[in-house]
């Protein structure tokens, strides 16, 4: 567990996804809680199903906010930056 709070750096795509999540009426507080947990360097709960991604998203991680609402992120350890890459449904993010 990290002792230093990470700097949160949302991508342009994440900012658009965030606005779409609000428009869809999703409980944005759930997303913000997960982001805060990650930024504090704490471990997510098992129900968030946090795991590494492969393929085009290699080097990133994914966690579940809700069963079909995901957050793709990356922690850049040397500079302690939490990069928020995307958020949305499985089909939004992976076309499935």
Q: Where does each model-flagged region fall?
A:
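Basic, Lys/Arg-enriched alpha-helical interface segments
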Residues: 1-67, 76-83, 87, 91-96
């Amino acid at each position: 567990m990290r002792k230093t709070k990470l700097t949160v750096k949302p991508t342009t795509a994440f900012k658009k996804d965030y606005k779409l999540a609000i428009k869809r009426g999703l409980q944005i507080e759930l997303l913000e809680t997960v982001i805060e947990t990650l930024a504090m360097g704490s471990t997510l709960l098992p129900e968030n199903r946090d795991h590494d991604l492969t393929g085009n998203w290699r080097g990133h991680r994914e966690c579940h906010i809700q069963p079909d609402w995901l957050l793709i992120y990356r922690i850049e350890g040397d500079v302690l930056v939490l990069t928020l890459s995307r958020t949305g449904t499985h089909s939004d993010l992976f076309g499935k």
